[in-house]
């Protein structure tokens, strides 16, 4: 009886922590950091899935989200995955309409994502060298390349 109870509890806990975004990302997303985010009735995960399919509206909404603390590192890594899939050229067109404040926030979010991403193509790189066009669009001139 204990064995069945344990299996039931493990299954329940696993189902609570699973999400449908991480399956499409190259890393496991700590979904609890994002579970309260809803934009126009869409969850963070729905926006991520839409963005990974190239949906411009989802990409723009995700690029505008401001998340604090550790969540910003993971959110930045998500944005890097999106840029990698949709290409930097398409991403630049989509985010070109951001306000100056949103552009500054996006810069720091992607900077944090470069610190967090497990993708060897981007991990530990600087935004100035890996995405110079994005840095130019975002207008962040006074930040050193590191």
Regions found by a protein language model. Name each.
Residues 53-63, 88-95:
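Amphipathic alpha-helical scaffolding segments comprising HEAT/armadillo-like alpha-solenoid repeats
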Residues 70-146:
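Extracytoplasmic electrostatic interaction patches
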Residues 4-13:
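Sec-dependent N-terminal signal peptides
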Residues 21-39:
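N-terminal low-complexity, Pro/Thr/Ser-rich intrinsically disordered segments
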Residues 17-18:
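Bacterial signal peptide processing site
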Residues 33-35, 46, 63-68:
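Second-shell loop/turn segments in exported
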Residues 28, 38-47, 73-76:
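Boundary/linker elements of alpha-helical solenoid repeat scaffolds
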């Amino acid at each position: 009886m204990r064995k069945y109870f344990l299996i039931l509890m493990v299954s329940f806990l696993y189902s609570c922590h699973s999400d449908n975004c991480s399956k499409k990302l190259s890393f496991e997303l700590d979904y609890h950091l994002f579970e309260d985010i809803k934009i126009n009735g869409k969850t963070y995960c729905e926006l991520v899935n839409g963005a990974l399919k190239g949906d411009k509206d989802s990409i723009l909404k995700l690029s505008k989200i401001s998340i604090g603390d550790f969540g910003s590192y993971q959110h930045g890594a998500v944005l890097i995955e999106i840029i990698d899939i949709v290409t930097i050229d398409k991403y630049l067109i989509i985010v070109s309409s951001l306000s100056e404040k949103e552009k500054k926030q996006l810069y720091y979010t992607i900077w944090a994502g470069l610190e967090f991403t497990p993708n060897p193509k981007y991990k530990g790189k600087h935004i100035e060298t890996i995405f110079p066009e994005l840095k130019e669009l975002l207008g962040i001139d006074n930040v050193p390349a590191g």
